[in-house]
Amino acid sequence: MKFKVNNKEVFASTGGRPFDKNKPAIIFVHGSGLSHITWVLQTRYFAFHGYSVLAIDLPGHGYSEGPSLKSIEEQGKWISDVIDSTGIKEVSLVGHSQGCLITMECAAQFPNKVKSLSLMGGAGAMPMNPELLDLAEKGDLKAVDLMMDWAHG
């Protein structure tokens, strides 16, 4: 499903069922560098068991337009904008990894919109190496190499 948020096209998987804003809704939020694909099995299960689901691609990820948002606060606000754009009245948010931080931020900023949170594989905010951050902001692919070296030792 594609829809607009802040004049940018957003992609969300609906688990193989049409989205219905009148059903109980769940928004699944992926981690950094990932996409809606993280949630393929979960969205399908809940979509076929009475829920409307959206596994969104954050801006700059997957099939969603726009540059990546710079802060967790901006991303939490963006999730609220997704809620408003789709007409959902109250939603359960599910986050993985950085998606945990984003969903917690959304719930903190907009508690009247969020019914519940489910957090998987979350962690606290990590300090970033300034050199790595600089390379990533410039779009230098060396940033990916550095992250992979760190991740795989």
What is each model feature region?
Residues 3-15, 40-48, 52-98:
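Active-site loop/oxyanion-hole signature of alpha/beta-hydrolase fold enzymes
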Residues 22-31:
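Short beta-strand element of the alpha/beta-hydrolase
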Residues 26, 76, 100, 129, ...:
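A general structural signal for well-ordered alpha-helical segments in protein cores
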Residues 31-34, 97:
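Active-site glycine-rich loops that stabilize anionic/oxyanionic intermediates
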Residues 33, 58-62, 124:
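Alpha/beta-hydrolase active-site loop signature
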Residues 89-127:
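Conserved hydrolase catalytic core segment
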Residues 118-153:
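Helix-rich cap/lid subdomain of alpha/beta-hydrolase
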